[in-house]
Amino acid sequence: MSSFLNFNMNKEMKSYLLGFLFSSLLTTLPFLLAIEKFFCSEVNYIIFLLCAISQIIIHFVYFLHLSFDPEERWNLITLLFVIIIIFIVVFGSIWIMFNLNHNTM
């Protein structure tokens, strides 16, 4: 019984638990703000955006274990490449759809 009370979590488990707590908080905060309407809608949008960006960063740090260590530089370069490709695909598709709509109207 005493080993249960004095258990020692490793560093990875602490990271996952802390990330889960932060992401849970950053998920419930926008829901509460949307339901209770504490602020005007413009302030809520800004808070939602900040919560979303911080949750992305928390997922990268605590769950994907991305850091700025020299050993993990390739992971960051790969992530940057993926973000650029997604940006090109999404905004290229929007641009094509806008031009198609403009040319057909």
UniProtKB/Swiss-Prot annotation:
The taxonomy runs: Bacteria, Pseudomonadati, Pseudomonadota, Gammaproteobacteria, Enterobacterales
The subunit structure is: Heterooctamer of two A chains, two B chains, two C chains and two D chains.
User: Which segments sit on the Cytoplasmic face?
Assistant: 1-14, 67-75
Family of this protein = Belongs to the cytochrome c oxidase bacterial subunit 4 family.
Question: Which InterPro entries does the entry link to?
Answer: Cyt_c_oxidase_su4_prok, Cyt_o_ubiqinol_oxidase_su4, Cytochrome_c_oxidase_bac_sub4
One annotated Gene Ontology cellular component of this protein:
cytochrome o ubiquinol oxidase complex
Q: Which GO terms describe its molecular function?
A: cytochrome bo3 ubiquinol oxidase activity; proton transmembrane transporter activity
Q: Where in the cell is it found?
A: Cell membrane
What kind of membrane protein is this, topologically? Multi-pass membrane protein
Summarizing the function annotation, the protein's role is: Cytochrome bo(3) ubiquinol terminal oxidase is the component of the aerobic respiratory chain of E.coli that predominates when cells are grown at high aeration. Has proton pump activity across the membrane in addition to electron transfer, pumping 2 protons/electron.
- Please indicate the ranges of residues that lie on the Extracellular side: 36-45, 97-105
Question: Is the 4Fe-4S keyword given for this protein?
Answer: no
**Any idea what this protein is called?**
Cytochrome bo(3) ubiquinol oxidase subunit 4
Q: Does the keyword NADP apply?
A: no
Q: Which residues cross the membrane?
A: 15-35, 46-66, 76-96
Which UniProt keywords are given for this protein, alphabetically ordered?
Answer: Cell membrane, Electron transport, Membrane, Oxidoreductase, Transmembrane, Transmembrane helix, Transport
Q: Name one GO biological process term.
A: electron transport coupled proton transport
Which species?
Buchnera aphidicola subsp. Acyrthosiphon pisum (strain APS) (Acyrthosiphon pisum symbiotic bacterium)
